[in-house]
């Protein structure tokens, strides 16, 4: 009789085995047939070979098997036979409708996860990826997944000669807000050692930001993405974040100077460097280096974007020069024209834009060959229809 209170399916069976008191081994095979029968098999190993007539018949054994069912499973047949060394036991079980014990499902691997970052930028680095036996997990006595859950492979086998290395991170700046929630930043430089070959640029971020929190203001908290306050042409320009000054790297400063020099030709005010924009640009530049495509970020919000790709190791100043050259084809009489052939130029000189952040990624594509991906982010964004005339000013003869 079925009893709903049972939560464990109980099997009773006879074993033909050599009774030595050892724990019963796990079933090696579990099959669910189409007629509602479940068959399980296992091999009972013996410590030494014996003649078949030396194998006594064991007393009746009873074994509990787990189940998520609330019904009782009934054993209908128990077969076994012996050879000289082992006993091969097969248990055949019939399951009434609703007995969860008979819903056998073997485990299957999930998809491989993403590769971890390489443990070294050159020499003998390694990276790994993993997967889990959860798609689905084994249930009802089903088999575990076959194979390994982790793979490890070599990466960045190139020589370290001429490859740059990062300095230690500098100190975190003070919080950009004197109370509640703000942002702080720190930087490092590719000077330990500096690269001596074009493809030797350091990989990764030269700066990072984090949310900071202070107390003292009895007002609602808000997040500030305060930008840098920068002198546009000074070779010693610095970024102001709260009360602490963080110097730009030489390449960041050169990039900012190149932007502001071109903007001055068109009567646009100088830009300020923004670490948050630069971080966003760096994330997308790394994505482009992986896909080796040049396309705008489809998820960008409230930021303008200029893109640059080239064979070889180039710098931001090269990209700015290329973007500015688009201006020779710009039609100053068309206030509603957004032209892909000149959109980098118009964003570069857009009068109402006030902040910029740029990232450069140099990707090794083959031995001795690299590609450069440069992404610039701007805010407020430019290239707004109906606003070109007031934001893209025709240069005067004196400015040319």
Swiss-Prot record:
GO cellular component, one term: extracellular region
Presence of the UniProt keyword Disulfide bond in the record: yes
TSP type-1 domain location: 106-161, 163-218
Disulfides per UniProt: 118-155, 122-160, 133-145, 175-212, 179-217, 190-202
CDD domains with a match to the protein in the record: CAP_GAPR1-like
Location in the cell: Secreted
SUPFAM superfamilies assigned to the protein according to its UniProt record, in alphabetical order: PR-1-like, TSP-1 type 1 repeat
Superkingdom of this protein's organism: Eukaryota
InterPro entries, sorted: CAP_dom, CAP_sf, Compl_asym_regulator, CRISP-related, SCP_GAPR1-like, TSP1_rpt, TSP1_rpt_sf
Chief localisation class: secreted
Tissue expression remark: Component of the acid-insoluble and acid-soluble organic matrix of the aragonitic skeleton (at protein level).
PANTHER family given in the database record: PROPERDIN
Coiled-coil features, chain-numbered ranges: none
N-terminal signal peptide: 1-21
Protein name (database record): Ectin
Domain SCP: 256-362
Alphabetized UniProt keyword annotations: Disulfide bond, Repeat, Secreted, Signal
